[in-house]
């Protein structure tokens, strides 16, 4: 299942098309450390079809598979490989957002059931994002049901996140759906920090209060610059303190940006302390880092992983397929930013798509031998 996503065929049929070609069956056996029983299975080596994988996935508890990405990220944390990704060298940033998993089959009453998933991803160094947890939700009307379903899923996800990482200092990166009392209460109860996009229509009174008090504090201003896709982006950061959000009081940060092609205003509400020394990091290393989870969804949707593709109709198997997709994404991050990055440093324009093509060709054509050297260490920077 993991190879289905690592090789980015986008569907089960694409994987089945090559599964018994060339050196692929023997290489998969070597990689999985599985000996081929010729007496029982014959001399021709094969890889099981995806339908058998679906049958197996439909029998395995989703909660058990969900522990795999958590265990992988926990291992990376214990190895201290991700320490440089913390905000202010303290807060582990976790981006939370929902997306369409796939459009399920029509129900008996003729309505389409949409499978949505809420994902929590750890923001790492060097632009990496590691999917950590997923909460699944079904809805018939994405426009009408999305808010209630996603906020309820957030409550369940927050409970799991707290149980698995009770002592980690966490800062949640949230979109404009989340600046509401239940989310504020959860962060206060668990001692979490948060940076959430603030939309004018979501909290109109708080937004107006923030604008008015910001205009009365001209000294709370910082001029900065960041690197943009089209050239340098000039930033004007302004902020205000103690803005009431119902029973809570938070800080609001405004970021006006002018790039060579556009002008944009970003607004965030946060319970982090804002000062002249800290606002640049809060805006650029915190608030804007939430885009990493949208980039993750974009790669999984359009980069061959198959997010939004219906891999199977069985709900349990479909959820397990999605979780293994997250496992494959973590593995790809480690490969692409680790050993493959060092091996291909001379090829600056080598894309992930080309790397996947080379990996697929190697598995089909080059035998994996048992005497291949093992990896000595894992690192993301050649100078480390």
Regions found by a protein language model. Give the residues of each.
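An anionic, glycine-rich sequence signature occurring as long contiguous blocks
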Residues: 193-293
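Short helix-capping/linker segments at secondary-structure and domain boundaries
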Residues: 6-14, 124-129, 330-342
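Domain-level cores of phosphate- or acyl-group-handling catalytic modules
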Residues: 144-205
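Electropositive, glycine- and tryptophan-enriched low-complexity nucleic-acid-binding patches
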Residues: 110-169
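Active-site-proximal, Lys/Arg-enriched surface segment
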Residues: 45-46, 51-133
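A short, flexible helix-boundary coil/loop motif
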Residues: 20-22, 29-30, 34-35, 218-242, ...
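Short, conserved catalytic/metal-binding motifs centered on acidic residues
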Residues: 1, 15-16, 49-54, 90-101, ...
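Gly/serine-rich nucleotide phosphate-binding loop at the start of the catalytic core
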Residues: 1-47
